[in-house]
């Protein structure tokens, strides 16, 4: 455990609240990967920030559970409980581990971290999401994480490959009932800017799983529908947020050139 003053010395993010959450995420990820070497594949914004150098902060811990695991719901719940129990900071559940209608095991914990001063506003909230029953087409990569924080131990995480991340982000963007799709557009912009391969067959498989019709027009409409929420990303990125028109034009051009739709 580290003190509030020690934590204040770290400048991993502009916002001290984000620094504290980043630290607590590393503690929890160590706890997970100390007990689970081959079953939990990290994805989502936290994976992008910690392993792919994205500058977008993410609050959640998002995983896909390996198909090889039997009794997936029970296994996912036990992984969350074991990781949380080993956390040295005082904590409680806001939402106990449970499975939702989409086959995702979720939980939300409240943590009194180094910056906690007795007020409810200083309690950290961390959400777990573990997708069950989902097919991983490209496997995963074992990637080491040497955290900058003094008492956060190094760990090796299994991380979803960039090409599959990109395919899942296209599916997420085109899932019109999904919240925070501006984050999906930003992540597409980030990975396309890194020349991540756009795999047509993989993208079509991912869309088919969600009963989404592959369509350039539908993709464009999905992007247009989030223009009003684009600026909500400003507190979450560490550099100046690019204009929506620039990002959307860039992503749509890459998709058009790839011949995906």
Regions found by a protein language model. Give the residues of each.
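Structured mid-to-C-terminal alpha-helical surface segments
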Residues: 1-40, 51-56, 66-261
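Glycine-rich beta-strand-to-loop/alpha-helix junction loops that act as flexible
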Residues: 42-46
